[in-house]
Amino acid sequence: MRFLGISGGSAGGNTEQALLAALRAAQTAAKTPATISLVRLKELSIGSGALDGHLPLPVVGKSNSTGPVSDDRPFILDQIMEADAIILGAPCITRTIPWEVKCFQDSTLGPFQDVTMAQKLVDAGKGHLVDQRIFKPRVLALVTLGGAFTTEWAPFTLPLLHQVFFPLGTQIVDQMQVFGTGVPDSFLLNSEAMVRAEELGRNLAQQAQATTEGEATYVGPRGMCPICHLSMFNFVGRDAVECATCGAKGRMGVGDDGHVEFVTDSEGESFSVLRRSGLKKHLQDLEQGLQAEGASTKVLDIKNELLKLGQSWVVAPPSRGGR
């Protein structure tokens, strides 16, 4: 069993401490010998030119340390592909996640590692273009910590961490959010948070084992959305509501206990990006867009006009020869 911790925090900081506590508990709870690895996103080298998502195939041993800017994306992707269970942790910075996490997501994962797109390539007889490990079942746990003691200062951390791995079809089985960790080692002083991190690690190990015997299930705290178990929603019509985290569709209602609840059904749940059906719907939308007619001469003329304006107005930074 291979466990991977991915930290978006500082070396030895509160986020890393929480990940290590969870990983240690996972190692102890694992029914088979466990291999533990920890990657610090702040230590990865990802050049600005890497945002096109191009990675050599297969990725094993393909990290480029000799180019103008070292590219560690193949290294981290190989770690992910080998993992059976992953814990992704990040601190809360200005109510959201650090830029290193988003850069890692956009340059390494996203549509470039989409399990639905990969399956389409295989079905089209182009399996040689796909790293077959992408189809491996994996479980994921999420951890976020912030300095504030109140929820309004950390609304986007867990919802955004949910976006990192869903293209891979990785199943989230637990998640935790810790408040009041704004100074070094404050996580270690929070005995309740330590106990919760260890519980999360054990849950991850148990559900990773479940993938070998059947299907893993979510065992973390329950939220209003039955899919992602968070409680952030978009009101997209007079009555229509969408889960802002995963995209499940439904409406708001009042339960028998008098509390507001999110009401959905199997059709509404099928739009969730955490469901394979949601990924397929998105792929169909993209394919429909690709079938649009080519640009007209008028559109091309406007495009060229705007490009010329951009060339005359852009201000280059010193690193690109600017003053």
UniProtKB/Swiss-Prot annotation:
Required cofactor names: FMN
Pfam families: FMN_red
Biological processes, Gene Ontology terms: flavonoid biosynthetic process
Domain of life: Eukaryota
MF terms in GO: oxidoreductase activity
The EC number(s) this enzyme carries: 1.14.-.-
InterPro entries xref list: Flavoprotein-like_sf (IPR029039), FMN_Rdtase-like_dom (IPR005025)
Biological pathway: Secondary metabolite biosynthesis; flavonoid biosynthesis
Keyword Transmembrane helix on entry: no
Disrupted gene: phenotype observed: Results in the accumulation of intermediates that all bear a hydroxy substituent in the C ring and lack a double bond between C2 and C3.
Keywords: Flavonoid biosynthesis, Flavoprotein, FMN, NAD, Oxidoreductase
Function: FMN-dependent oxidoreductase; part of the gene cluster that mediates the biosynthesis of chlorflavonin, a fungal flavonoid with acetolactate synthase inhibitory activity. Within the pathway, cfoJ acts as a flavone synthase (FNS) and catalyzes the formation of a double bond between C2 and C3, converting the flavanone into a flavone. The pathway begins with the PKS-NRPS hybrid synthetase cfoA that uses benzoic acid or p-hydroxybenzoic acid as a starter unit with four rounds of chain elongation using malonyl-CoA to form the chalcone skeleton.
Protein name: Flavone synthase cfoJ
Species whose genome carries this gene: Aspergillus candidus
